[in-house]
């Protein structure tokens, strides 16, 4: 195999590894839970059990509230209603 062929195979292999996220760097830096959008209306505290912050690696910083039914709801941590709920509910370790 000539040099161009070897180079082409190496580049294609590297691209496949990066795309699949199988490399150590790609999977190690991937945050577990990020918010893609935020809950717009305030949530009643009676429906919630706890909360935890999103990873600092997420593009949208937020808070994830856990409901008593086991659902997760993203909220903007800069909103007053979110700050109030964060003070009233326990933090869940994630």
From Swiss-Prot:
Q: Which PANTHER family does this chain map to? A: C-C MOTIF CHEMOKINE 3, SMALL INDUCIBLE CYTOKINE A
Natural source organism: Human herpesvirus 8 type P (isolate GK18) (HHV-8)
Name of the protein in question: Viral macrophage inflammatory protein 2
Cellular component aspect of the GO annotation: extracellular space; protein-containing complex
List the CDD domains: Chemokine_CC
Q: Which GO terms describe its molecular function?
A: chemokine activity; CXCR chemokine receptor binding
Name the SMART domains on file.
Answer: SCY
Underlying gene:
ORF K4
| Disulphides | 34-58, 35-74
Does this entry carry the keyword Acetylation?
no
Annotated Gene3D superfamilies:
2.40.50.40
């Amino acid at each position: 195999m000539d040099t161009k062929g070897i180079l082409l195979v190496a580049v294609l292999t590297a691209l496949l590894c990066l795309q699949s996220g199988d490399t150590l760097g790609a999977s190690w830096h991937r945050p577990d839970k990020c918010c893609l959008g935020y809950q717009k209306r305030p949530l009643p505290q009676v429906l919630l059990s706890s909360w935890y912050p999103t990873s600092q690696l997420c593009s949208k910083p937020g808070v994830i509230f856990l409901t008593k039914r086991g659902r997760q709801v993203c909220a903007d941590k800069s909103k007053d209603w979110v700050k109030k709920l964060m003070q009233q509910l326990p933090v869940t370790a994630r």
